A protein has these predicted regions:
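Amphipathic, interaction-prone secondary-structure segments
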Residues: 11-43
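Acidic, low-complexity intrinsically disordered segments
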Residues: 47-108
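Short intrinsically disordered terminal tails
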Residues: 1-6, 104-108
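Generic preference for well-ordered secondary structure
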Residues: 3-12, 65, 69
Length: 108
């Protein structure tokens, strides 16, 4: 029996990127090998302005798991989210939510 201490499992390292999409400040957190080798966990948060609607989340936070190769192919976590946001920004639901938010802003 060895007296050497047991090796603690290394925690996945997080990388945070800040980016802007259509005037909205956001962050993208990328954790590699989250579920196992080759699987990434991405998190997106709306930083400013708080409460502004974005097309892929109603809460300002999004958690997404995907293959690491998909993150690389997109050009990184911020590029992955910006492409997703651009695709979904054309939806009727998003345009309606944005119009409602802008109308409320007039009365602030």
């Amino acid at each position: 029996m060895s007296n050497a201490p047991a090796k603690a499992k290394a925690r996945p390292r997080k990388l945070v990127e800040k980016f802007a999409w259509r005037g909205i400040e956001m962050s993208a957190t990328h954790t590699r090998d989250w579920l196992g080798e080759g699987w990434s966990h991405l998190e997106m948060r709306v930083l400013k302005p708080k409460g502004r609607p974005v097309p892929i989340t109603d809460t300002g936070y999004l958690s997404h798991f995907l293959d690491e190769n998909d993150v690389k192919a997109a050009g990184g976590p911020a590029a992955f989210f910006m492409a997703w946001l651009d695709r979904e920004a054309e939806s009727k639901a998003y345009r309606k939510a944005l119009a409602r938010w802008q109308q409320l802003d007039l009365f602030a």
